[in-house]
Regions:
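Membrane-helix interface motif
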Residues: 42-51, 164-171, 346-361, 426-443
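Short aromatic-rich membrane-water interface segments that cap or initiate transmembrane helices
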Residues: 55-70, 177-184, 364-376, 445-451
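Cytosolic juxtamembrane amphipathic/interface segments immediately preceding
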Residues: 56-58, 323, 400-404, 524-537
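Hydrophobic alpha-helical transmembrane segments
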Residues: 65-74, 190-191, 374-383, 449-467
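Hydrophobic transmembrane alpha-helices and their helix-loop junctions in integral membrane proteins
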Residues: 80-95, 101-116, 126-412
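Hard-cation-handling environments
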Residues: 409-460
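Aromatic-capped, Gly/Pro-kinked transmembrane alpha-helices
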Residues: 436, 440-451, 472-561
Length: 561
């Protein structure tokens, strides 16, 4: 077993080797991604690297069941996404993506809050560069800058929380944090912003779809799931996460149903699925924590598959709206099948990975007698089938004949989708392959007759509801307003209004000072006789003091008010 070799090192080495002439840069990155994945499989549980820094104990490297599971899926999806991205012309995007992945792996292997924060900020920089590298999209620059601002805000909040927490607790080791002081709440807020929790959830749908066909796949896997890891590590059992999770679940469903853009549908679906994970973390039992971890693992796989199928459509047609595509199953059958498998997995269809993972969270709520939470999770499962399980494949691959006849995407893209499709089914049929990675040895059997029948009935009625409501679900060329309107448009309007008010008051005070100046000058001219000579000039001290007093009073009023 391997103790101290950090998987991120090989990804960073891959980036360095891309600057060497005569090397095939993409194959070099692919090779180092493979090495990093193989290394993650052999990380030794209990391995750590400790360091003393400014009277604090830093733990730069910590391997346990939770962190190793996340490292395995992070390196695995990096390898598969790299296969998918072999046709990506921008080497800058791939370098940025590997920096991004390295930072995410560093974050989940950090055993202290300072190391976590450093990797957290590097992750924000890397992901921003992934978005900005899509120079063919005129919207990517502004979306990337908004994305960066939101994550810098989250980073500042997290930094203040960590500094305050360290000053009180005299300890920065990253373990379960109690919400008994304001600084722990700030740390929680920093994590939730990156998780895509309202009111900042809009950054996911604002930024991810503006990346390239391959960049979106990388982005979907790491930022929100690193936050899920951090919440598991620091705030498992915090009831407030249940409520945040439920809001995210239904927020994602509603906006995904309203959306017309293919990848924005799937971006809102990310928020929805992370909401399920937050509910599991908030419940805080061994079963629900296991469920949150496995669901994060499975979600990375099937969400990447869905985004790869959507990216393949966009890559081959240059169309990204549901209203512009349809009937693509005729010429893109493999992409269609892979997209359907991803849709079934996200819908928790039996024999797929979503069924064996999400059900642990739902069952965790039932076992804790959280009846209202259980009902909402069941209803939300039907909602997921509506927007991602049926809407996405129906409008993109079936429904109308758009007249488009694109070919299948390049073979490397097909290979990546086929691998992910296989994994969705593999973990659905053999869930113990995933369960053996979990931190808690909690027996869970997903395939009971009651559970399978109930889930099939739920999906059947949700499917019927979709086709009954189909006339109302057909998309038009509309724009969906989200919370980001508040800072994209509302904040700008507010600042412009403030600027105008300040400008008007500046003019008013300027006129007032001019009037005072004229008044004082007149007093000086009257009091100072220039005709009798310098030696005979005299000054009326009382008038001068009066004028200065008026000026001082006005100056104080301006300063105070």
């Amino acid at each position: 077993m391997i103790n101290f070799i950090h998987p991120s090192l090989f990804l960073l080495l891959g980036v360095i080797f891309t600057f060497v002439p005569f090397f095939n840069k993409k194959l070099v990155l692919l090779l180092f991604a493979l090495i990093s994945f193989l290394l993650s499989l052999f990380l030794n549980y209990g391995a750590s690297i400790d360091l003393n820094f400014l009277s604090f104990e830093l733990q730069l490297f910590r391997v346990d069941f939770i962190s190793k599971t996340f490292v395995i899926i992070f390196t695995l999806i990096t390898l598969i996404a790299s296969i998918y991205a072999l046709n990506q012309k921008s080497i800058l995007e791939l370098r940025a993506a590997y920096l991004y992945v390295s930072a995410a792996i560093g974050a989940v292997l950090s055993g202290d809050l300072i190391s976590l924060f450093v990797f957290w900020e590097l992750m924000a920089i890397g992901s921003t560069l992934v978005i900005l590298s899509n120079t063919s999209n005129k919207h990517s620059e502004l979306s990337g800058l908004r994305y960066l601002l939101i994550h810098l805000l989250g980073g500042v909040i997290l930094m203040v929380g960590i500094i305050g927490y360290a000053s009180i607790e005299k300890n920065i080791l990253f373990s379960l944090l109690n919400l008994d002081n304001h600084f722990s709440w700030l740390i929680l807020a920093g994590f939730l912003i990156n998780a895509g929790a309202p009111p900042f959830a809009a950054w996911v749908a604002d930024a991810y779809p503006e990346a390239s066909f391959s960049g979106t796949v990388f982005l979907s896997a790491f930022t929100t799931k690193t936050s899920v890891y951090a919440l598991i590590r620091g705030f498992a059992g915090s009831e407030i996460l249940i409520y945040f999770g439920l809001v995210m679940i239904f927020y994602g469903i509603i906006y995904a149903l309203l959306e017309n853009d293919i990848r924005r549908i799937l971006a809102y679906s990310i928020v929805n699925q992370v909401g399920f994970m937050l509910v599991g973390i908030g419940i805080g039992t061994q079963l629900s924590i296991n469920g949150a971890i496995t669901h994060a693992f499975a979600h990375i796989i099937y969400k990447a598959l869905l985004l790869m199928s959507a990216g393949s459509v966009i890559y081959m047609t240059q169309k990204r709206r549901c209203t512009d595509v349809g009937g693509l199953y005729r010429t893109m059958p493999i992409t269609t099948i892979c997209g359907i498998i991803g849709a079934l997995a996200i819908s928790s269809f039996p024999l797929t990975s979503g069924f064996t993972t999400k059900s642990m969270i739902v069952s965790g709520a039932a076992y804790e007698h959280l009846f209202s939470v259980w009902i909402l999770l069941v209803a939300a499962s039907a909602g997921v089938f509506l927007h991602a399980g049926i809407k996405f494949p129906w409008f993109v691959f079936f429904q109308k004949d758009s007249g488009l006849r694109p070919k299948e995407p390049p073979k490397n893209m097909l290979l990546a989708m086929v691998i992910l499709s296989f994994l969705c089914i593999l973990f659905g049929i053999f869930p113990n392959l995933l369960y053996q990675l979990l931190p808690f040895d909690k027996l869970y059997i997903p395939y009971t007759s009651d559970h399978v029948i109930f889930q099939l009935q739920l999906l059947l009625f949700a499917g019927l509801a979709f086709f009954v409501m189909l006339p109302w679900l057909k998309r038009t060329l509309t724009i969906t307003l989200d919370f980001d309107w508040l800072y994209r448009v509302g904040l700008i309007k507010f600042l412009n209004t403030v600027r105008k008010v300040i400008h008007s008051y500046t003019i008013l005070f300027s006129k007032l000072f001019d009037s005072i100046k004229i008044f004082v000058q007149n007093k000086i001219n009257v009091s100072f006789n220039t005709e009798t000579g310098v030696g005979k000039n005299h000054w009326m001290t009382g008038n001068m003091v009066f004028a200065l007093s008026i000026i001082l009073l006005i100056y104080l009023l301006v300063l105070l008010f």
